[in-house]
Curated annotation (Swiss-Prot):
Disulfide bonds: none annotated. Residues 337-388 form the FBD domain. Signal peptide: none annotated. It holds the Pfam family FBD. Coiled coil: none annotated. InterPro entries: F-box-like_dom_sf (IPR036047), F-box_AtFBL13-like (IPR053781), F-box_dom (IPR001810), FBD (IPR006566), FBL13/AtMIF1-like (IPR050232), LRR_dom_sf (IPR032675), LRR_FXL15/At3g58940/PEG3-like (IPR055411). Gene3D superfamilies: 1.20.1280.50, Ribonuclease Inhibitor (3.80.10.10). This is FBD-associated F-box protein At5g60610. Residues 1-47 form the F-box domain. It comes from Arabidopsis thaliana.
């Protein structure tokens, strides 16, 4: 202990900044010197379900260092006090807060965590993460977050229709956006994401959400992930020329999304019901830069989709297939389809495909025929892995 106490205050503060806030606070009992060191830690994490810890930090927080880089708060309905969030937020924002995360998951609609209005005009805020239906996003008209680069909204409540459009329009440097809607998000009718600077976008939409179209205009996007469980897929997505990677999980009607992600190098697909028809698929959808394709098999006639993708991915190098263990066939397999397929061998099989992985293989006729076709036609194949 004597050797540690001999270190300068700056180094001691750096050391205790790597431990949980509760542990950092407990060091205040070690000696007179240690009594105030934790107050200079720039990152705070507080579980507000522990009244003693909450009260101690709130009592001492006004004396905190000039800058609070990160604040992480966790609330529960039974221990939530409305004045807490106002006090926490006000103090943190006045100390040049850069990162804020609030978790408040509750099975009840009320009470809501109402964020202080000053949060929506915080010039220093770079990262904002709000998780839980207990949090209500009430965006004021004067919202302005000039430094915000990362925004996560997971299952939060919204005060009025279309608050997201207002919020996003006032984040001029936003780069990373995650939106996860919940069954209770009735105020979000049409999801509109128009952010010229956005580079990463993740959307999760449950089946119970509105079937209204959502609009995405993100010309600088590099990574796109969408999980849409609605039966009716309805979206307008403008061209994303910078896109490098996409993860798509939909129930059906995947064509619109595929048309928007043709520039990707890595593509992951999961479609619950197969709606692709090789004779009706939109012309001109070619994945010229696609090198790695990962496909989850969970629908009948999945080979139609795979072959179509192979035919339109001339430079594909890696193919990963994963058969869903819960997948059950509802239609009779038509083996005659392979006669037509083998007349036109995809270009990637002749010149670029080097790796094949097939997980969840069960030796069904369609699987056997597909693998037989690949092994016969893939001239450049170097490695393959087949597993149950």
């Amino acid at each position: 202990m004597d050797r540690i106490s001999g270190l300068p205050d700056e180094l001691l503060v750096k050391i205790i900044s790597f431990v949980p806030t509760k542990v950092a606070v407990s060091t205040s009992i070690l000696s007179k010197r240690w009594e105030s060191l934790w107050k200079w830690v720039p990152k705070l994490e507080c579980d507000c379900t522990e009244p003693a810890l909450r009260d101690f930090i709130l009592k001492n927080l006004p004396l905190q260092a000039r800058i609070i880089e990160s604040l992480y708060l966790r609330f529960r309905r039974e221990s939530f006090l409305f004045q807490d969030i106002k006090l926490w937020g006000g103090i943190a924002i006045s100390h040049c807060l850069r990162e804020l995360r609030i978790d408040f998951f509750s099975h009840y609609a009320n009470p809501y965590v109402i964020l202080p209005r000053s949060l929506y005009t915080c010039k220093s805020l770079v990262t904002l993460k709000l998780l839980g239906l207990g949090i209500r996003v009430d965006v004021p008209r004067d919202v302005c977050l000039p430094s915000l680069k990362t925004l996560l909204l997971q299952c939060v409540a919204y005060s009025e229709e279309d608050p997201l459009r207002l919020l996003l329009s006032c984040c001029p440097v936003l780069e990373d956006l995650v939106i996860e809607l919940d069954d209770a998000n009735q105020n979000v009718k049409a999801l509109v994401v128009i952010v010229p600077t956005l580079q990463c976008l993740s959307l999760k939409i449950p089946a119970s959400c509105s079937d209204e179209r959502y609009l995405i205009v993100t010309p600088s996007l590099k990574y796109f992930k969408v999980e849409d469980d609605r039966e009716i897929f309805n979206a307008l997505i403008e061209n994303m020329p910078e896109l490098e990677e996409a993860d798509i999980y939909v129930t059906q009607h995947i064509e619109t999304l595929l048309e928007s992600v043709t520039s990707v190098k890595r593509l992951t697909l999961r479609q619950l019901y197969n709606s692709i028809d090789e004779y009706k698929c939109r012309a001109g959808i070619v994945f010229k830069q696609l090198e790695q394709l990962e496909l989850s098999i969970c629908s009948d006639n999945w080979t139609k989709l795979v072959i179509w993708l192979l035919q339109n991915s001339p430079n594909l190098r890696v193919l990963n297939l994963d058969a869903d263990s819960d997948y059950e066939r509802y239609e009779e397999y038509e083996q005659d389809n392979w006669k037509n397929i083998q007349r036109s061998v995809p270009k990637c099989l002749k010149s670029s495909l080097k790796t094949l992985e097939f997980a969840g293989y069960t030796a069904r006729p369609e699987e056997r025929d597909f693998l037989s076709f690949i092994f016969k036609k893939a001239r450049c194949l170097k490695t393959s892995s087949i597993s149950h």
